[in-house]
Amino acid sequence: MKLWGGRFAKGTDKLVDDFNSSIRFDSRMYRHDILGSIAHANMLGKCGIISADESSLIQSSLKNILNDIEAGKIDFEIDAEDIHMNVEKILISRIGDTGKKLHTGRSRNDQVALDIRMYLRDEIISIKEMVAVLLNTLVKMSESNLDTIMPGYTHLQRAQPITLAHHMMAYFEMFKRDYQRLCDCYSRMNILPLGSGALAGTTYPLDRYMVAQELGFDDVTSNSLDGVSDRDFAIELASCLSILMMHLSRLSEEVILWSSHEFSFVELDDAYSTGSSIMPQKKNPDVAELARGKTGRVYGSLMTLLTVMKSLPLAYNKDMQEDKEAIFDAVDTVKMCLPVFSNMIGTMKVRKENMYKAAQGGFTNATDIADYLVKKGIPFRTAHEIIGKMVLYCIENSKAIDDMTMEEFKSFSDKIQEDVYTEISLEKCVSGRKLVGGPARETEEKAIENAKSFLSSLD
């Protein structure tokens, strides 16, 4: 008989049991469910709602159940529906009627809200640690490539010269924001919903703050309806993870391009590449491709959560059972991607000479020649037009701007002097951009110093 079966004249059909059950995926929350129940039982005893002996027996029995689960001695039952009812059923089978007192002042509605918050906050901590590893990897790579000149791109067309350090530190900033978003998400998640009951709280004199303190929550929810029906924290986490995966996907795309023979900017380590079953010469960037592909999977989890919640009236509805597989899969996917991605980035070989050669083509110093004319007193728009014509001339004559003679330069503007050759060198183009946020070495060194300071401050 179901623990809630008193109102029913007959049991549920087996098809309903299978359809209704969530134990196959919510069993991963067993530890959090039991720890929440231990804290609840402790509070019930301290508040005199059950006796101290009963509270002690329940707590010790729950600890034994936890140990038995972790030792693989317990098989969960589908007809017990979920992790909450499975644990309670086992408890009652071991200590009888005393076990039936555990659920006093509690509903599965606030119980599951507690469990999933506890589970996800642990996962946030784990993911933050993985992001921190990636951030460290990016800093190390940047520090090793402060003078590695490469083309910066817009529209995937060569635009202006930068350094690989500057490029990778751009990703540092992205993943730093991801880390900070996870911290913010944690703070909103870390609120105790237990005590909200089914939807309207309880008449028992519970001490919610005692439970919150024991379980490490910062506060308790202030509205019982919201406490049991809120899944914003899961949606927010899925959103944070989607943005994180978007950043992984962008860097993946660049690694895929850079490792191609068409670019040949980097070579992936053999340990993070794969081959072809038919083409012996192939060395494929499968890690980057899978990270790019799995991004859509995490997006799908976010859309699932939003769709599940979009039309639900207050308070709890069974639809909300669908939240778990979506957020669990998003978490699992991100945790699978981050470590292997960090190792791939950390072990890839940079082909500095190819990057430099690419920066020499595509007229990446054209903006600097325009700026050179501006410094000589020519309005920027006029300078822009002059250099545009100069680029066209070079294209038609198959030469780089650097290869033009002084006579050729003078044909476009008599303001151009011999110092132009120094001013438009790739090294000068990069070193001249000293503003905060620019690619000049001294600016990038400061950015790396700030990055290290941020990383050292992480808890």
Swiss-Prot record:
Q: Which PANTHER family match?
A: ARGININOSUCCINATE LYASE (PTHR43814:SF1)
- Give the GO biological process terms: arginine biosynthetic process via ornithine; L-arginine biosynthetic process
Q: What is the organism field in this record? A: Ruminiclostridium cellulolyticum (strain ATCC 35319 / DSM 5812 / JCM 6584 / H10) (Clostridium cellulolyticum)
Q: Which InterPro entries match?
A: Arg_succ_lyase_C, Argininosuccinate_lyase, Fumarase/histidase_N, Fumarate_lyase_CS, Fumarate_lyase_fam, Fumarate_lyase_N, L-Aspartase-like
Name the domain of life this protein comes from.
Bacteria
Q: What is this protein called?
A: Argininosuccinate lyase
Similarity annotation: Belongs to the lyase 1 family. Argininosuccinate lyase subfamily.
GO molecular function list: argininosuccinate lyase activity
| Gene3D superfamilies tied to this protein | Fumarase/aspartase (C-terminal domain), Fumarase/aspartase (Central domain), Fumarase/aspartase (N-terminal domain)
